[in-house]
Amino acid sequence: MRLEVAMDLSIFEKMEAPELRNYLEFLLWHYRVIDAFWFLYVAERFDQPTAERLNEKVWSRAPQMAAKDLVDRFKIEEKGLKGFVRALRYFTWTILVGYEIEEKPDEVIISVPDCPTQMARLRRGLQEFFCRDMHKGEFEAFAHAIDPRIKVECIFAPPEHPPDMFCKWRFTV
């Protein structure tokens, strides 16, 4: 049973599509900014390993909630890789990062040639952070909310990756 949260959505009633899109871009951008500052300030106040561990905890929980909500809101009934990909296309980070999703008969491959998080760190003179465990938890939580049979395999992820690709993931049933 989902409890509805009271929100005043009346501002959207008079918005045309371009204005709604502009606002959606604003929300997505600030979603990413909050996530980034949260991580940076935890690392600054404590240390990088603590920030990474806390990030892993957050990202092993939030995607499960998102997947369940997306299934409900968008009436996604498919299971397996089809249902996973359909829900994943609505997922906030798919939109923010621009996951390249390759669907094959027995597997799905997600590639990330341009990772906004790692690229921002490099621009600021910071090293890439170890994100494999965090993303494994994220993808497993999301995938298992769609179908617990889905297996997640990291092909590679920062800091160990080829120069033209930050990470690549394989999903199978």
What are these regions (language model features)?
Residues 135-139:
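Long, well-ordered alpha-helical scaffolding segments within enzyme catalytic domains
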